[in-house]
Every structure is written in structure tokens, then in C-alpha cells.
Amino acid sequence: MDGLFAPIPSNPLIDFTILLLVTLILPPIFERLKLPGLVGLLFAGIVLGKSGLGVLNEDSESIKLFTDIGKIYLMFVAGLEIDMVDFRRTRNRSLLYGSLTFAVPLLTGLAVGLTFGYSFNASVLLGSLFASHTLLGYPIVQRLGIVRNQAVMVTIGATIFTDIAALLVLAICISIHSGSFSPAGLVVQLVAIAVYSALVLIGFDWAGREYFRRTGDEQSNQFLFVLLAVFLASVGSELINVDKIVGAFLAGLAVNDVLGNSPVKEKVEFLGTTLFIPFFFIGIGLLLDLPAFLVTLTTLFPLVVAIVVGLILSKGVAAILAQWKLGYTWVEGLTMWSLSIPQVAATLAAAVAGYQAVNAAGDRLVSETVLNTIIVLMLITSIVGPLMTAKFAPKIPIPNTLSSLTEDLDDPEENGAVTLIPPKASTFTVLVPTQNPQTLSYLLEMGALIARHESGVVIPLAIAKAPVHMDDPGLTSRLARNELLLQQATELATNLKVDAHPALRIDDDVARAISHTAREKNADLIIMGWSQQTLGLRAKLFGSTIDSVFWSAHCPVAVMRLLSDPRSFHRILFPIKNLTPQTLELFQFTQRLAETNGAIVTLLHVCPHNTSPQQVQAFKTEMERFLNQCRATADYPIKVICHDDAAKVLVRVSHTFDLVVLRSFRRRSVGGVALGEVTDKILREITSSFVLFGDPYA
């Protein structure tokens, strides 16, 4: 239809600007309405497309490019987010559950398609759309501390099998639909897919490791390498007549181990989740014909019900069969079911690929009716799945990680390189950068107290920014100023009866100077000052000094905001989310802080409001065992509060404490210092002193 804004010229710049504006404004509005942000993007696509104002044209080259990149990025991130370490631990069980949660929904979708008169090929593709799933409930189980539960790990691992199998079925169905299918051709196609998959999974993994090893800390080039890998794999898949999303997903799996939890991964995901993936969802809205969509919901309502109910029930049957075969509890089986319900990433990308597959007769493999129904399915399952996870997952007991703690620590490679601070034969060394004179006094005092407790030394570090020429007059003045700072720091340490070994570096990168000096001096701990700018947009886009030190340092890093003399800290709050080896390390650090002043450490755990009294008591018992594992000699009060807003509780409780100890979680962020959502909110609102602790590779 001719839109109201038809006079506006259509060009890539205008299209891109509109897409950015929509991506920025609409998702937060819909989230305030308790709806997923992607619903807002779909709504925007409908309003701006042919069924609304006609501002954006889905057939324009720029829109096609943006949505294609978004689709590729969506599948790449889906492969990148799979935890390969957990998958390797449970691969046999994951294969069993993956086979069940693929086969049962596939057969169900096939039956639904044939019942409603679709061809066998289209019905098989419909079944494959049922088979995959998106782990929208992962943040819930992660918040509850049950990610290490075997049933949850198996469900996560099964995602690899379901997504790969569904994408392979898509490739075959598109080949058949194009008319180029024959038994011999199918064999050739399968061989080509197998060879191509091996080249991507093995070749890209090897190339990535070699490139990252040779480039060291050159994150910009590594970032470009990852982008090249994604799009090269996508182009390669099209060369063998397989949809580009297959290559993107395989590329995500291939570079998964190479990236680990590095800053490069965070920035790659940041680019996709904030820019290109939202464009894909807007593009889906542009494809929707609103009158046809309403017709689907009314005249073809039985098809909608059959697809939605068939998907949910088939996933339930697969979960029950796996629960029975693997010996899990009913609650674990129901949680597996809830996690496998949401249909977003692979499902939607495959549905769009099928919709865009047109044969010589002009027929689409996935009809407009089915595409509309799949969108309804996505909306319903993306809401129902997480709601069910939130209902069933809290009933799963938190895994008893203490029983296997020693085994995990003995194998740091298997456990994500956990590095407890062991007693060393050499002198305990604390490194304190002196970049900010206003915070130097308290930071150095804290470092000296810890070093004195360990009969160690403190290294005040001053860094002069390196100019192009070493005879620059500005460098001379900076060196003089830094030498004065080091002299003051040495006097302060001497007053606290601690040996100080000052160090002065000339470097053009502050973070690199800190991490290199720490390694050269064999430091056991780095203490830095907190900057509120670390939470700003610039830091999230480009990183910060704190972020870089967190990622590059060989030893634990403690970033502190100290509002008073550290010797006055007598009440320390230690929030404890779940019992892991990393928690043990952080608690050991907190013990050190407490013992320097004879402070009392209070352990606080915030659990969901619907947690049963039995579960609360069980967690208290686990924490008591945890303290015994730490060989705690003092009494440590334990608090458990049931509330759904952990950040709000922690901020409120922190008012009565002198110091709060928090951890930097790298996994769940997209840029800057990687913080959990709760930690990020706490740091923005907390009014007391705090320590943000990060250990290498965590």
C-alpha cells in the first residue's frame, strides 16, 4: 500500500537510521509492559512495513542486507553461547535427550503438516522447526544456581544436536523444493555437508587458535577475524547449496573454544545483540502481511492450535522419556521440558529461510500461513517457556558442589581454570597502582594491611604515559610527579610497618603496564580504585582500564571503592549466590580482609520468594558445610532472605555494613567490565564501600 510517508526517499542511510531509532526506543517500552522486547521489534516491522505506514520496503537491497546479517548473527551467537565444557561432560546423555527432543517433535510436526494438507517435504520442514529450541530460560536457572545440575546441563548440551539436525533437515528440504533432488544428488549433498562441516569446525578452530596466538592482545584484529569467520562460513554454506544460517551456526561452534570468555567474545556479542539481531526481527515484521496474519488467527485457528499445542506436548513427551531413561526426578524432567519449549533463534531463522525458498513454479516451501503461525508459536513459547522454568526450576535442589570441589580444583582446565590463592614459598606480594592520588591513601592502606597479615610486601606502581620521543619535556614532568607519589606511598607503607618496593613504568597502555608488572613481580593480588565511568556507555563500547586488567592479569584483581579508613571496617557483607569453587576463592579473600581488622563477615543469600522453608534450611546447611570446607575458625552469621529482587535486598542490607564484597561475572555481559545484572544494579545504587573481585579466566 502507498504509505503516508511515500514522499520520503528510500535509501540505505534513511533505512539504517529508522532501524536504529526503532531498536533504541521500542524494546524497553514493551519490556515495561511485561512483554519480550522482540515483540516490540516485530510490531515496529508491521507498522513500518507494507501493512502499515510503508516507510520501509522489505524488498529493498539495504533491508535485505541488514536482515540477512541479523539472521546470520543470530545463529552465530546461538552457537557461540553453548558451553562446550559442560557439553563434553554430558555429551552421551545430551545425545540421548537431543535425539528424543528432535525426533518426537519432528514426527509431531510431520503429522500436523500432513493432517492440514501440506506436502510431505513441507511437513518434514515443519517438524524440523518443532525440533530445535532456544534457551530463553537459561538466565533463570543460572540465577538459581542450578546450572551445574546434570538435567540442566544435558538440556543445554542437547541444543547442539537439535539445532544442527534441524538445520541439516532444512538444507535437504530446500534442495528438494528447488527441484534439484535425486537419490544420487542427496548423497552428494550429504557428503558435501559433512566435508564442509568438518572444514569449518576443525579448520576454523585451528586457524583461530593460531591467529589469536600470533596476535596476542590485538583485540581489534581478533574481532575482525571472528567476523570474517562468520561470514566466510555463511558464504561457504551457500556455495554447497545450504542455507547461510547453517554456516553461521557452525562458525559459532568452531570459534567457541577459541574465544572462551574473552573481551573479544563480549564485543562480538555486543555488536550482534544491540545492532544486527534486532534488525532481523524488524525484518520479520516487514514480511508480515497483517490482513493475512489476522486471517490465519481466525479462519485457520485450528492450525495455530495444532502447531502450538503439538510443539508443547511433543517437547513434554521427549522430556518425560529422557527423565525416565536417565533417572531424573519429576521436577528435573519438568524443568527440561520448560527449557526446551521456547522457539526463537533456529526456528525463526529456518522458517524465514523456508519462506524465502521459491521453486521454479513460484511456490514457497514455507507458506505465508505457516510463517504467520510460526511467529505466533514464537511469541507464545517465548513467554510460556520461561514462566514454566520459573515455576519448576526453584524446586530443584542446588547441586552439592562441595562434594566434588576437590576434584574440580585438581582439574582447573576442566573447571574453567579455577585458581585458588595458594600459600606460596615466596613472599606474598600486593600490587597497588597509584594513578589516582585522591584514592591512593585508602587503597595503599588496604594493600599494606593485607600484605602485613601475610608477612608480605606491597608494590606501589606509578605509570607515566609514554610519548613518541623519550626526550619529551612532558615525560620528564610526569616522571617527577610519579616519583613524588611513590615516595608518599612508601612512607605510608613504612608507617604501617610493611616493606614497600616502589615501581615506575613508562608505557602507553596503563592496563598493560599493570598486568605486565604484576607478572614480572609475581604479584599475588592487584588492588585498584573504582571509577563510576566503568558503568558508562563508552566503557561498554570500548572497554576500560579496569576491564582490561581483569582480563589480562595472571592473579586476582580487587577493584575497591573505599569511603573511609580500611582500619575502620568491622562489618563485612559477603553475598553468596551459589556454592562453587569460585565462591570458595572469593571467601578466602574475604577472610583475609576480615582477619586484618578482626572484622565479622556475614554471609547473605537471596533466594526467590517461592522457595520452600525446606530448601532454605537445606541451603543454610550447605553453607555451614561450606564454612567447614574453608576451615573457618570464627563464627560467621548466615542470613537467607526470600525475595525476587536480589539487588534491591543487597542494597538495602548493605547500609548496615562497612564493606560489601562482590564478584565480577564475565559470562553474562556484552561489553565493559562484565557484571551480572544484579551486580550492575548494586554498583549503581550502593552507598557503602565495596570490593569487586575478579580472578583470572573466571
UniProtKB/Swiss-Prot annotation:
Family statement: Belongs to the monovalent cation:proton antiporter 2 (CPA2) transporter (TC 2.A.37) family.
Function: Na(+)/H(+) antiporter.
This protein's name: Na(+)/H(+) antiporter NhaS5
Ranges that cross the membrane: 10-30, 35-55, 65-85, 100-120, 121-141, 156-176, 184-204, 222-242, 275-295, 300-320, 333-353, 370-390
PANTHER family: NA(+)_H(+) ANTIPORTER NHAS5, NAPA-TYPE SODIUM/HYDROGEN ANTIPORTER
Gene Ontology MF: a single term: antiporter activity
Native species: Synechocystis sp. (strain ATCC 27184 / PCC 6803 / Kazusa)
GO biological process, one term: proton transmembrane transport
Subcellular location per the Swiss-Prot or TrEMBL entry: Membrane
Keyword Membrane belongs to the record: yes
Membrane topology qualifier: Multi-pass membrane protein
Short name of one Pfam family: Na_H_Exchanger
SUPFAM superfamilies referenced in this protein's UniProt entry, alphabetically: Adenine nucleotide alpha hydrolases-like
Coiled coil: none
Gene3D superfamilies xrefs: 1.20.1530.20, 3.40.50.12370
GO cellular component: membrane
